UniProtKB/Swiss-Prot annotation:
It comes from the Bacteria. The modification 4-aspartylphosphate is found at residue 48. It holds the Pfam family Response_reg. CDD domains: REC_OmpR_PrrA-like, trans_reg_C. The lineage of its organism: Bacteria, Bacillati, Actinomycetota, Actinomycetes, Mycobacteriales. It comes from Mycobacterium sp. (strain KMS). Gene3D superfamilies: 3.40.50.2300, 6.10.250.690, Winged helix-like DNA-binding domain superfamily/Winged helix DNA-binding domain (1.10.10.10). GO terms for molecular function: phosphorelay response regulator activity; transcription cis-regulatory region binding. One of its GO terms (cellular component) is protein-DNA complex. Member of the two-component regulatory system MprB/MprA which contributes to maintaining a balance among several systems involved in stress resistance and is required for establishment and maintenance of persistent infection in the host. Functions as a transcriptional regulator that recognizes a 19-bp nucleotide motif comprizing two loosely conserved 8-bp direct DNA-binding motif repeats separated by a 3-bp spacer region. Phosphorylated and dephosphorylated by MprB. This is Response regulator MprA. Residues 4-118 form the Response regulatory domain. Residues 129-227 bind DNA.
Length: 230
């Protein structure tokens, strides 16, 4: 059965262009012209992923993200926007988007990001994958549970993938380019700050009760999971 993608955009030309491109690449595509229609379609026939514009009438894309995430729905969401400022990208990620693509974009890039997003949705860990532990931090690839000491930590799909990479490589400095390629699925533009935003999310969540920092920046290189700063 083909993967089902819901495309949500108030611009008919954009909707039709994405429908043709995604359909040509083997996806089953549904269309919605605003956030209200999108939420109704999701509630009645949940897709496998959503391509979601930000600026729309009635209900914008960020509010759609917030409403879905507030109910615990982890539906994969790729946000599209005509605005490409740092604050706009952060707003999209904060609202719960899994990825962010500014307009205008190349269809090849959207398809690559969608493939990467769907790979993160369907992790290939086997049933016997062991839990990963570093000091008092534990991540279980099978149950998707994360704890620090006795405290449960709730992570989004992308946060989990990023922390899993770090905890699987303790005390090893991981370059920014390697993390972007493995977690997001391909090389991001070096000017993007998605990685920095998600590192900030992980730090806040893993240090929420005043625990010592474990995720450290190696300036000009990348990040490392270790007891003390490098």
């Amino acid at each position: 059965m083909p993967v089902r993608i819901l495309v949500v955009d108030d611009d008919r030309a954009v909707r039709e262009s994405l429908r043709r491109s995604l359909s040509f690449n083997g996806y089953s595509v549904e269309l919605a012209q605003d956030g209200v229609e999108a939420l109704d379609l999701i509630a009645n026939n949940r897709p496998d992923a959503v391509v979601l514009d930000v600026m729309m009438p009635r209900l914008d894309g960020l509010e759609v993200c917030r409403q879905l995430r507030s109910t615990g729905d982890d539906l994969p969401i790729l946000v599209l926007t005509a605005r490409d400022s740092v604050s706009e990208r952060v707003a999209g990620l904060d609202a719960g988007a899994d990825d962010y693509l500014p307009k205008p974009f190349a269809l090849e890039e959207l398809l690559a990001r969608m493939r990467a997003l769907l790979r993160r949705t369907s992790p290939d860990e086997g049933p016997d994958s062991p839990a990963l532990t570093f000091l008092d931090l534990t991540l279980d690839p099978v149950t998707r549970e994360v704890t620090r000491g006795s405290r449960q930590i709730s992570l989004t799909r992308t946060e989990f993938a990023l922390l899993e990479m770090l905890i699987a490589n303790p005390r090893r400095v991981l370059t920014r380019s390697r993390i972007l390629e493995e977690v997001w699925g391909f090389d991001f533009p070096t000017s993007g700050n998605a990685l920095e935003v998600y590192i900030g999310y992980l730090r806040r969540k893993t240090e929420a009760s005043g625990e010592p920092r474990l995720i450290h920046t190696v300036r000009g290189v990348g990040y490392v999971l270790r007891e003390t700063p490098p």
